């Protein structure tokens, strides 16, 4: 790939409002099973789908999950990204903050690019025959700096979610 021109593509992920997404990079065919087991161990009520793009061998999108809709959604997004060794996790009835340590602890996981409920787009770089994730566009830009009222509202929200006493 040395000396090959690079092109960039923005891939907007398909995601209902009530679904969170985690996008990362891993390696090895065992990734799908290990991510599934890590997620399943967090909570019996967590619904999820996982898709992983192989970068060599059969070069298939490997998939798993406990929710058919979320698994299909993860596969469609992985196919759209089409970057070697990338993975997509779609979550419902739980938040990324509840699973991030488990996801990052999976031995095959190299990087987590994003974990969000926001609209998200993946910046994909293509060079020669390969594709890779160059970056993430997560949500919208800020419109100001929080006031004391905003700080109080943030603290209330975290307590409503049960993350703070």
Predicted regions and their residues:
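N-terminal, charge-rich interaction modules
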Residues: 1-63, 148-165
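Gly/Ser/Thr-rich loops at beta-strand to alpha-helix junctions
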Residues: 27-30, 56-57, 66-68, 92-97, ...
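Short, well-structured alpha-helical interface segments that form or flank functional binding sites
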Residues: 30-34, 84, 98
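General "foldedness" signal
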Residues: 35, 49, 53, 62-66, ...
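Aromatic-anchored, charged helix-turn/loop surface patch used as a conserved interaction hotspot
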Residues: 50-88
């Amino acid at each position: 790939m040395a000396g090959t021109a690079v092109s960039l593509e923005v891939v907007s992920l398909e995601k209902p409002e009530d679904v969170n997404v985690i996008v990362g990079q891993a390696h090895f065919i065992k990734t799908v099973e290990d991510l599934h087991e890590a997620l399943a161990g967090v909570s019996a009520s967590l619904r999820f789908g996982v898709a992983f793009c192989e970068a060599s061998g059969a070069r298939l999108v490997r998939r798993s999950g406990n929710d058919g809709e979320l698994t299909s959604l993860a596969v469609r997004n992985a196919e759209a990204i089409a970057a070697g060794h990338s993975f997509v996790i779609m979550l419902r009835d739980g938040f990324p903050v509840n699973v991030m340590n488990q996801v990052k602890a999976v031995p095959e996981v190299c990087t987590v690019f994003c974990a969000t409920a926001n609209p998200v787009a993946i910046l994909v770089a293509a060079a020669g025959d390969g594709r890779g994730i160059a970056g993430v566009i997560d949500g919208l830009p800020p419109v100001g700096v929080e006031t004391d009222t905003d700080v109080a509202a943030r603290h209330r929200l975290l307590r409503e979610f049960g993350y703070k006493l």
